[in-house]
Amino acid sequence: MRRFLLLYATQRGQAKAIAEEISEKAVTYGFSADLHCISESDKYDLKTETAPLVMVVSTTGNGDPPDTARKFVKAIKDKTLPPDFLAHLRYGLLGLGDSEYTYFCNGGKVIDKRLQELGAQRFYDTGHADDCVGLELVVEPWINGLWAALEKHFLSNRGREDTSETLTMASHASRDAVTPELLHVESQVGLLKLDDSGGKAAKVLEQNAVNSNQSSTLIVDFEASLTHSVPPLSQASLNIPSLPPEYLEVHLEEALGQEESHASVSLVDPVFHVPVSKAVQLTTNDAIKTTLLIELDISKTDFSYQPGDAFNVICPNSDSEVQFLLQRLQLADRREHHVAVTIKADTRKKGAALPQHVPERCSLQFLLTWCLEIRAVPKKAFLRALADHTGDSAERRRLQELCSRQGAADYTRFVREAGACLSDLLRAFPSCQPPLGLLLEHLPKLQPRPYSCASSSLFHPGKLHFIFNIVEFLSNTTEVILRRGVCTGWLATLVESILQPYMCANHVDGKKALAPKISISPRTTNSFHLPDDPSVPIIMVGPGAGVAPFIGFLQHREKLQEQHPGGHFGATWLFFGCRHKERDYLFRDELRHFLKCGVLTHLEVSFSRDVAVGEEEGPAKYVQDSLQRHSKQVAGVLLQDSGYVYVCGDAKNMAKDVHDALVEIISRETGVEKLEAMKTLATLKEEKRYLQDIW
């Protein structure tokens, strides 16, 4: 069987899952995938590799390769490597990203570019899958086209002309081969082909006269929804993926009294269990978003940080949602039983392994509370598996539609874009009764949530501040449910007893109540830090909660200036924005203090919802408007004074708008075309003078 090397670089498991899918399908087409995480450098050697290489690479942070790929990227970026170092290598790469972020798929692009520079050649076009619109829109056709590309590679390299049988098996894949980065989402949905992991043609479900006779007259009265389809989908024969092979055996055993630790859900970083020493509401009660500041007491730990760092908060799922699942799965009376997980002896899943995020011994309630991301949007493979555990034929048909090729648009609209989760599906399809093992196979790890440090350890020794908006939204899949963010909702509830209301932050000790504790862990180092040279000018752009790291910056600068009264400190610009001056102007008093004492030299604040009277050119509604108004100064700081620009906050709109504003400013002030201005900004990023902390 023809071997290829298959490497994945993953941050949250997405790239790994896709690589495993490729590995499972490979056998069908006469290939053998040698599957490894890119961090397992002792198990492969690109310098001597003769087989083709297939890579699946995700993107994290500000367009960075995932943590698992850091050593790999560092190794291939070694400037001493000759330009023909990998000239023998042939590869295909699938990049995963989110176009809401400025540096889309940059993790894959960085590796792709460097492989090219070292002489490696593509045997298959690079794919760029966009999580903003649905990874599957590129992932599925990219995988389908991979087999024909591999076949062509082996034929051309080894001169095999006796592979007609294998070519026949690969022919249906070649018909669907596309250039993924050119795939137009809206017009190319029909290109998707869902093949099963066993390699047979996708199963076709014929809906006969029973379906059409009983439903057609009624269905026209409905609009399409999560639970109902309309023609032509409701009358179509469906191409659905075959059932993913089950591979986990789960037994619930009587508990023996062992204690569980939150640390068991974190496998890499050290975990610190620290008390909350203060909690303050930073916004008025009538503000559109409620923002809280939390102070942690880290004085009895060796946790250290510097302004600009971020850290993880280990959070649980909502207790009410966990209890719903226990009741719905008919396991409420066994919530304290211990979960024992093993690999099924007869599983067909290649490389089946126990999920690392499931502790060896934990209770069922602990598992659902601390280990599984029960809010995750179900992938199509999960829907396919759920369909086989759904008793009602109409409900089963609808789940099959949602995971089918024909139902791709419905899946995007009613599952993906609606943010439907397992609880929503179980409410929508009452006859669906999945076994616990299925949840462990398909639900990802509950990830810790990252937050920016909003303080300086020089200014607040032994303390760590962070701020957040309490996320609230309506789940409107089948019934309207008000939900809070997994972590922000939990934190808000946790600090209720000690929360200081708006404008009462000066009462340092807060309410006399038992201080709650939370578990935190450090995040890998980043470059979102103040310049080493304090004389270098900086521009900070942080609307809303994005101001958090800059409070730490300014606190740090204030202490440095106190320690070095004769020192030279560069100009500091802060572009802050909020909706209303009187409702959500975060840290107003602190910013005025920094301005008064000279730590902050320029403060520009924009209010997007306030109506200003008497301003000739109208108020600056957003931070990008304020940047444009100070175009010459901004360009001077960046291009003449070798300054830094920091952007923190919303990736979906703000970061893009600020990026575009900076391009326009550079173009206008230097008299160059926008393409050249974009190159200049890219150079600033490479020099780590244009830094982003966006989410």
Curated annotation (Swiss-Prot):
Give any Pfam family that matches: NAD_binding_1
GO terms for biological process, alphabetical: folic acid metabolic process; homocysteine metabolic process; methionine biosynthetic process
Q: Determine if Oxidoreductase is one of this entry's keywords.
A: yes
Keywords, A to Z?
Answer: Amino-acid biosynthesis, Cytoplasm, FAD, Flavoprotein, FMN, Methionine biosynthesis, NADP, Oxidoreductase, Phosphoprotein, S-adenosyl-L-methionine
Q: From the record, give the cysteines joined by S-S bonds.
A: none
Cited InterPro entries: CysJ-like_FAD-binding, FAD-bd_FR_type, Flavdoxin-like, Flavodoxin/NO_synth, Flavoprot_Pyr_Nucl_cyt_Rdtase, Flavoprotein-like_sf, FNR_nucleotide-bd, NADPH_Cyt_P450_Rdtase_alpha
Q: GO CC annotations?
A: cytosol
Q: Which positions bind FAD?
A: 449-452, 485-488, 695
Q: What is its main location?
A: cytoplasm
Q: PROSITE patterns this protein is in?
A: FAD_FR, FLAVODOXIN_LIKE
Q: Which CDD domains match?
A: methionine_synthase_red
Q: Which GO terms describe its molecular function?
A: [methionine synthase] reductase (NADPH) activity; flavin adenine dinucleotide binding; FMN binding; oxidoreductase activity, acting on metal ions, NAD or NADP as acceptor
> Phosphoserine (modified residue): where?
171, 187
Start and end residues of each Flavodoxin-like domain? 4-147
* Residues holding NADP(+): 289, 608-609, 622-624, 657
Tell me which residues make up the FAD-binding FR-type domain.
269-531
Question: Per the record, which residues fall in region Hinge?
Answer: 166-245
* Location in the cell: Cytoplasm
Positions binding FMN in this chain are: 10-14, 93-124
Which EC number applies? 1.16.1.8
Tell me which cofactor or cofactors this protein depends on.
Answer: FAD; FMN
Quaternary form? Answer: Forms a multiprotein complex with MMACHC, MMADHC and MTR.
Q: What does this protein do?
A: Key enzyme in methionine and folate homeostasis responsible for the reactivation of methionine synthase (MTR/MS) activity by catalyzing the reductive methylation of MTR-bound cob(II)alamin. Cobalamin (vitamin B12) forms a complex with MTR to serve as an intermediary in methyl transfer reactions that cycles between MTR-bound methylcob(III)alamin and MTR bound-cob(I)alamin forms, and occasional oxidative escape of the cob(I)alamin intermediate during the catalytic cycle leads to the inactive cob(II)alamin species.
Q: What else is known?
A: It is debated whether the reduction of free aquacob(II)alamin occurs spontaneously or is enzyme catalyzed.
Q: What is this protein called?
A: Methionine synthase reductase
Q: Which organism is it from?
A: Bos taurus (Bovine)
Q: Which gene encodes it?
A: MTRR
